[in-house]
Regions:
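Feature marking well-ordered beta-strand scaffolds used for ligand recognition
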Residues: 13-17, 35-516
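N-terminal secretory signal peptides
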Residues: 1-12, 16-28, 33-35
Length: 516
């Protein structure tokens, strides 16, 4: 780094944000008109943009074109064969010139994790099962605040709330091993983490006492459950950790939350903060290999670094909670990217939950954790701007949700390129960044596919690109969109390899060790 370049302190960084002269201008006033429906302005498009915009990227393929394929993705590999698992399907991506469906409907569940278990010599697939939430409907735009009976769907839900485990060693014949309930009156699970080792980390509220959730679209506050999966056929709960104040009987702690005041009638219902774990807690080094740390995105409570030295007694080591204007509305901290830990940083993003910029813009944060007892925000990613030839001057005027959703999953083939990261950015498409200098992230490429859905149909057309995954060794990017899965390359990542290639290294220490 240039010696003349000053490194921002936490105090200076937050002061700049508060005054609007720093990396992103901030306003603390909440909109007077707000709900989860569309909020067009005179400048807004009256249609969905079906055009494609590309900068510094190439499209290699579109898998399942025209289909809504925005779900989470995971990789597995057997020899030179590589497979992409998504939305219950297994897709053969070995030869990127002709990716093809391999096993359609081979498993149940879209919140998925897959990893190789060396002791069992099997690929183990874990999928989540979640009870209904209290999201807005056409008749109840403010969710549970408009219609308390929306919670009846959660209360009366009779199916599994928890996770399912499968033997995926033969991707053509995936076999269910067990179902694990996190609690019959709880939330089930949303975003989970499994690395093939002894433990899985589940994003859950295990029962109906976790009720202090201000958000209009969730009935409960989730925490982190650690489960022993040494035998995936018989998982066992190890421990549960949550934010004090989340449960009935913890009202004194709840009232200490600044977020407990951000509820109707003090704020408009769809500007309420999302409290608790969005998930998952990422554990980059397996506990049985000496790992002791987990990194979680806890909504309005921000980043929490977990001490997992004793998995039976989870502890909070430290955290960074964003300024209040970022916590009220949407999911302030949605995902933590741990691909820069060797350099002493993590990246965190929020999730915009309302369309047409009917919320404060939620930035992507760079957080210095070299002193893990005191995480310090040092930068925000630049806010995307539309292409010059787009029919709108701001993404707020393009219909749908504008904001980051997910970075690539931590588990992937190859060594993570520490100076490059793509983000799924809803209606702004896929955005790619140079993070060689963590204090000055720079956008270097983008891909914006056509918008899917129908503007006249509630709940469609507002996401565009929801997820992203990277094969670091073959240097290809997968963008999960509502018009298919796009396979992309970017010169900043390197020249893509399209031919079948055995995986010789995975992105984390001992990940999928022993897989052949």
């Amino acid at each position: 780094m240039n010696q003349k370049q000053s490194v921002p302190t936490r105090r200076r960084f937050l002061r700049q944000m508060a005054t609007g002269v720093g990396i992103a201008a901030v306003g603390s006033a909440l909109p007077a008109f707000a709900d989860h429906h569309s909020h067009p302005t005179p400048q807004s498009l009256t249609y969905l943009d079906r055009n494609t915009y590309v900068k510094n990227m190439d499209v290699i393929a579109n898998i399942l074109p025209g289909e809504d394929r925005g779900g989470k993705m995971q990789f597995m590999a057997i020899g030179t064969r590589r497979y992409l698992l998504q939305q219950g399907d297994v897709i053969d991506i070995s030869d990127l010139r002709k990716p093809q469906m391999f096993n359609k409907g081979g498993f149940e569940g879209s919140q998925l994790q897959v990893a190789y278990n060396r002791k069992l010599k099997k690929w183990i697939l874990m999928t989540g099962a979640q009870a209904p939430i209290t999201d807005s409907t056409e008749k109840a735009p403010m969710g549970k605040y408009d219609d308390p009976h929306l919670a009846d769907r959660w209360r009366n839900f009779k199916e599994l709330r928890g996770v399912r485990f499968y033997d995926a060693s033969d991707p053509a014949n995936i076999v269910k091993l067990s179902e694990f309930s996190t609690g019959s009156t709880g939330s089930g699970t949303h975003r989970n983490y499994y690395d093939g080792g002894q433990y899985a980390y589940l994003d859950t509220a295990p029962d109906d006492t976790f009720v202090h959730q201000p958000s209009y679209f969730r009935p409960l506050v989730n925490g982190n459950m650690i489960v022993d999966v040494s035998d995936p056929g018989n998982p066992k709960e190890v421990s549960m950790w949550w934010i004090p104040g989340s449960r009935k009987g913890e009202e004194a702690e709840y009232e200490k939350w600044i977020w407990s005041q951000y509820v109707p009638p003090k704020v408009v219902a769809d500007q309420t903060p999302f409290a608790g774990l969005h998930g998952p807690v990422y554990v980059p080094k397996k506990l049985e290999d000496g790992g002791t740390r987990g990194y979680g995105a806890w909504g309005c409570f921000g980043l929490i670094i977990h001490d997992l030295t004793d998995p039976k007694k989870q502890k909070k080591l430290s955290g960074f909670e964003p300024p209040p204007q970022y916590g009220a509305g949407g999911i302030a901290f949605h995902t933590i990217w741990c691909g820069m830990l060797e350099r002493g940083f993590v990246i965190a993003n929020g999730e915009t939950t309302n369309s047409d910029c009917n919320q404060i813009f939620l930035p992507i944060w760079v957080i210095d954790i070299r002193d893990e007892t005191r995480p310090v925000p040092v930068a925000q990613f630049p806010q995307p701007v539309p292409p010059r030839d787009a029919p709108y001057r701001d993404f707020c005027f393009k219909r749908g949700r504008f904001g980051a959703h997910n970075p690539p999953h931590l588990k992937a083939p190859g060594k993570i390129a520490g100076g490059f990261i793509p983000y799924a950015y809803f209606d702004a498409g896929l955005r790619c960044y140079d993070i060689g200098n963590p204090y000055r992230p720079d956008e270097v490429a983008y891909f914006i596919p056509p918008q899917g859905g129908d503007l006249t149909k509630f709940g469609t057309g507002d996401r565009t690109v929801s997820n992203v995954l990277v094969e670091w060794d073959r240097k290809v990017i997968y963008a999960a969109a509502d018009t298919g899965i796009y396979v992309l390359s970017c010169p900043n990542l390197g020249k893509p390899v399209l031919d079948p290639l055995p995986v010789t290294e995975w992105s984390l220490p001992n990940l999928n060790d022993g897989a052949v």
